[in-house]
Amino acid sequence: MPQLTERSAWAYKFEWTDDHLTPEQAEPLKHSYDVLAEECLNRLNAISPPQRGTLPRTSNTNPTPVRTEGTDAENKEIYPVPQRDLYALLKEHHTSDAKLDELWQQVNTIPDWVDWEQIERGQDVFYRYGGPALTGLTFQSLLGGMGAARVVETLARTGGFNTKVARRRLFETTQHILQCTRSLEGIKPGGEGHASSVRVRLLHAAVRQRILKLAETKPSYFNVKEWGIPVNDLDQIATIGTFSSSLIWLSFPRQGIFLSHQEIEDYLALWRYIAYILGTPDTFFTTTPKAKAIMESLFYNEVHPSEMSRTMANNIIISLKETPPTFVSADMLTASARWLNGNDLSDALGLKQISLYYWALMAGQCLFFAVYCYMNRLVPAWDRDHVRRAKVVFWDVIVKAKWGLANEETTFDFKYVPEYDTLTELGKHEERKVTRSAIESRNLRTFAIFAGASLVVLAAGTYASVKVASRILGTLW
């Protein structure tokens, strides 16, 4: 039996086992990466060179429109520059290049350990707890993940988390998650989630390649020796962990949601398969103990907030406050972050202090989610209907709605291009414009109902206890 040692990281306590990675054991993973994807990216760039002049997303996320020659009527029309689809290029040209075919065969080969029924159950887990899942992914996995100072250095150099574009980038990431979860066919080879995962894999290769090229001519731009290769294997493992393990053992429990053993195994199986498509070492997610151990190892070893961590975390709050569809205030967003990450980590990330009022709103939200999710889980028919409706609503809000991606699905092309002068800066907080959002009002009502019900139960219990005690004393005397 291995000797267990209790450790703590940011108010999270756990037992250190042989499955956990020490910093020394994790070090090689900082310098290894997806070589095959980068080799294929070079070939795809030769076949279809990326558009020149694609700049970092600092204020505008849309391709520059162009005019075409034609009739007077046609000349009045403005046509956007088409996005380059690396997945389509790979699909079209893999038969004419051995290296491209190697990648194509790899991503289209189903590992022996994949059980499609289990994968589908894992997809349903995401929607069964959809509200807490999106809350956890935003405020614990993403915002709290900004505490990993080493990883943040790569994100900061893309410019994709300044306040003007962070919200859209978050929606694009959510689009990928939804494509991987809203249907079983979508995650199978040729499906929308499968294709997007391949695109993201090649995008990671492009970011890595760009940063390393800049660092060659200006070593101070990115410290490879200290931070490792950009978008390395350890970073990729951490990313999969934030979408899976962190939800299971951090975000969900802190919102009063506890998955069954079967749900945990199913959800991990889904993300292990996504990791495989992304070119991420998936052996760390083969069992529940391993998946939990790698999350805890990275939480313990990697989360040490820097000044850039504070900038990125606060930019997420600024970019999301008072925006549709929720119109939630900055204080409510901060309450969500503090509830899910704890005060110690939140203080280290430079998040503002909030009043008890917003703590009460967050408590109300957790109560609402817990009751709603558990009630649906109790009745299979309700659960199926809830999952079905959640798939439609999430897609409509994130992808179709004008305040989301406006029905323009991203192909994960290389738009956050690192440059020497690209570094994410802290945005400015402005005065609140919306009095109170519907979400905040709902949370307040829920908290008030539960608080009132608790007082009634407490009063009734006290009254009953007094009556019983009186009768007992009466018989004794």
Task: Report each predicted region and the residues it spans.
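Mature, function-bearing regions of proteins
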Residues: M1-W477
